[in-house]
A protein has these predicted regions:
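N-terminal, positively charged/glycine-rich alpha-helical extensions of SAM-dependent methyltransferases
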Residues: 1-29
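A short acidic, Gly/Pro-enriched loop at the edge of an enzyme's catalytic core
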Residues: 112-123
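Conserved class I S-adenosyl-L-methionine
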Residues: 152-184
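A short SAM/SAH-binding and catalytic strip from SAM-dependent methyltransferases
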Residues: 123-137
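Conserved alpha-helix/loop element of class I SAM-dependent methyltransferases that forms part
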Residues: 28-57
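A short glycine-rich, Lys/Arg-flanked "PGG" loop and its adjoining helix->strand segment in the class I
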Residues: 137-152
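Short alpha-helix
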Residues: 194-217
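Class I SAM-dependent methyltransferase SAM/SAH-binding core
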Residues: 57-113
Length: 258
């Protein structure tokens, strides 16, 4: 395994616990899903069209967790590689690979330092993986390195507004709870894990400076039949119907970093 940061070590501890509490038990359900859906409330990709045709594409999933996204893409003809820093989640992913007969490489590494050759992939994806659990000043340039010219970066994260309204304790507020100025690295009270959330302007500048052009930014709202999540309860359906709690970014590699 490549060298990892102290924050990555903390997040590995946090996700080892989360895997024991929830993601190991939920993995079979997500692997079995026929439809691609995104985020806590399961917004169908068919209603968004953010991903495009993945058949024949080489895909790297950065912060893959139990690798259900890679499994979804493999069923659609992609050639995925999953990368994650948490051995427990990769063990769950391997068990699901054996059960469902879907095989692809799984690599234990931080998305900030991936032991794979440059320009090896057509698509890099992250649904609540590297997109919030890795330092974007490291993982986004690393995604750029891994992508071929014209390759796309796709990632889903919490919306900036949701982060600004998130209370340190209790349900989300309908008023701002923190300053946007200086928003970036976040340590929530009582949590071992470390999150990252750059405001939109800083994220735009980072992507452009790295050598990406922004293709799309989609704010997500729950489907009509959505219910509150049984485990990820930071934002309720009621709150998220009024304001987007999640967002998808799509960017294309056009040149080298500046």
């Amino acid at each position: 395994m490549t060298e990892i940061s102290d924050d990555a070590k903390r997040n590995r501890v946090g996700w080892t616990k989360a895997n024991a509490d929830f993601t190991d038990k939920s993995a079979r359900h997500t692997w079995a899903a026929e439809e691609i859906t995104w985020g806590v409330f399961g917004v169908p990709e068919a209603s968004l069209h953010t991903l495009g045709d993945v058949a024949g594409r080489d895909v790297v999933e950065l912060g893959c967790g139990t690798a259900y996204v890679s499994a979804w893409l493999a069923r659609r003809g992609a050639h995925p590689v999953g990368v994650d820093v948490t051995p427990a989640q990769l063990a769950t992913a391997r068990r699901c690979q054996n059960e469902f007969g879907i095989d692809f490489p799984l690599i234990e590494a931080s998305a900030e330092n991936v032991p794979l050759p440059s320009e090896s992939f057509d698509l890099a994806v992250s649904e609540y993986g590297a997109s919030i659990w890795c330092d974007p000043h490291f993982w986004i340039p690393e995604a750029h390195r891994l992508l071929r010219p014209g390759g796309r970066l796709w990632f889903l994260r919490n919306s900036t507004l949701a982060t600004l309204c998130a209370a340190d304790e209790g349900p989300p507020a309908e008023t701002l709870q923190r300053s946007q100025r200086g928003l970036g690295r976040i340590e929530w009270p009582g949590e071992v894990s470390v999150e990252w959330q750059l405001p939109h302007g800083e994220m735009f500048r980072l992507l452009r400076r790295t050598g990406f052009v922004i293709v799309d930014l989609v704010e997500l709202y729950p489907p009509d039949d959505a219910v509150d999540h049984c485990y990820y309860d930071t934002f309720s359906v009621e709150w998220s119907r009024k304001w987007p709690s999640e967002e998808i970014w799509v960017a294309e590699k056009t040149r080298g970093p500046q």
